[in-house]
Amino acid sequence: VPGMQQQGKGIVLNVLSTVCLFSNPGISAYSASKAALDSYSKVLRKELNGTGVKVLSLYPGGVDTEFRVASRPDYLSAEEVADAILLMLASSAKAHIHELVVRPSIETNFC
C-alpha cells in the first residue's frame, strides 16, 4: 500500500464472501475470518480516500471449486467470479465499484 500511495494510484481488491452479509451454522471460523477482512477493507477504504488508491470488496456467493467436497454446477464458476473482478477493475477513477455482491441464482438464504 505505501508504494501505491507514493505513486498516487493503485488497487486493493479483496475477495470476501456473502457470509459477511448472511452466514450459516457450522462455518463460524470461516465467517469470522471473512468478516475481519471485510472490516479491514472498509476502514482501509476510508484511510486511503483521496490518495488515488482504490479499495474494492467482492462478495461472491457459492462457487463451484475443488474446495468443495461435492461438485455444485448450480453455483458460480471461477470464471464468473473472475468476470466480476474484471468488471470492478474496469471502473473509472471517478466512479468505481467499491463493493459488489454476486450470487448464483439458486442462493436464497439472503432474505
Description of each model-found segment:
Residues P2-G8:
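A short helix-coil junction within the Rossmann-fold of NAD(P)-dependent oxidoreductases
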Residues S17:
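Residue(s) in the substrate-gating loop at a strand-loop-helix junction
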Residues C20-F22:
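Conserved catalytic-site region of short-chain dehydrogenase/reductase
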Residues N24-S28, D74:
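Active-site loop immediately N-terminal to the catalytic Tyr-X3-Lys motif
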Residues S33:
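Active-site helix of classical SDR
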Residues K54-D64:
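Conserved SDR Rossmann-fold cofactor-binding beta-strand/turn motif
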Residues S57-L58, R72-F110:
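C-terminal helical subdomain
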